[in-house]
Amino acid sequence: MLENYKHTTVLLDEAVNGLNIRSGGIYIDGTFGRGGHSRLILSQLGPEGRLLAIDRDPQAIEAAKAIDDPRFSIIHGPFSAMAEYVAELGLTGQIDGVLLDLGVSSPQLDDPERGFSFMRDGPLDMRMDPTRGLSAAEWLMKAEADDIVWVLKTFGEERFAKRIARAIVERNRTEPMTRTKELAELIAAASPVREKHKHPATRSFQAIRIYINSELEEIERALEGALSVLAPQGRLSVISFHSLEDRIVKRFIRHQSRGPQVPAGLPLTEEQLRSQGGQTLKAVGKKLMPSEAEVAENPRARSSVLRFAERLPA
């Protein structure tokens, strides 16, 4: 079933090039997906190199079985636990690069049975790992209208959040929704105005998915984990797909790139400043966006943003 869903890796070469691969280095692909980035990293590693992949989606773990390479291993779990995985392997502070490709993957969106898409009818699930936590249907059934409003506004910036939340609660009182098509049609009916070229359920589905999977909290923990595992001069390469994700990545790199707060004019060397604490990363280059050619070939790439940072010596 996995092969039925094509996945085109976004910003493939750019994201891996930003890791500055060393042939004998140790790298982490924190979001294996269908292995596009992992395969390219492996192609650039020498026999002594090593790649650890992470994914919480059971289908991604199944897809990883196709990689028969002694340099490669994968862990089934959230990338937010990266620091713990690396500590168990005794590799804390020895990782030469971490790559994170955030958000939902094309196979997840395109498989109606996963319940992520408002364009294809399927069970109203939306979990990255269907074996854990509440499904979207279960959460919507028990949630109060105010809670739904908060989720739609916070994670989807949905201006008709109150109307949609009220419609969801009223519908679930009479006949609980269990299908994505039911929710998409309800949202469309509750939205008095439509954005041009955008389905009215786009923002709400994004918001519910982010909430169900604790995506933003997972990103924050993953970034902190990456910082703790990287070796000096180790690279962080992060692809985000919407403003909420990119804002977290941008703020994290900016915060970790700040020097210590000391009075101006003190005669301190760069090494002495770092010893005061506060500066652990430096941004590398400018953010990258996909080319027009890539967007034409893969329209889902259009909103992607790629940022890099480098670990500074302690």
Swiss-Prot record:
Pfam families: Methyltransf_5. It is an enzyme of class 2 (transferase). GO terms for cellular component: cytoplasm. It catalyses: cytidine(1402) in 16S rRNA + S-adenosyl-L-methionine = N(4)-methylcytidine(1402) in 16S rRNA + S-adenosyl-L-homocysteine + H(+). S-adenosyl-L-methionine binds at residues 35-37, 55, 79, 101, 108. Keywords: Cytoplasm, Methyltransferase, rRNA processing, S-adenosyl-L-methionine, Transferase. Its EC number is 2.1.1.199. One of its GO terms (molecular function) is rRNA (cytosine-N4-)-methyltransferase activity. Its main location: cytoplasm. It comes from the Bacteria. SUPFAM superfamilies: Putative methyltransferase TM0872, insert domain, S-adenosyl-L-methionine-dependent methyltransferases. It is found in: Cytoplasm. Belongs to the methyltransferase superfamily. RsmH family. Specifically methylates the N4 position of cytidine in position 1402 (C1402) of 16S rRNA. This is Ribosomal RNA small subunit methyltransferase H. It comes from Pectobacterium carotovorum subsp. carotovorum (strain PC1). The gene is rsmH.
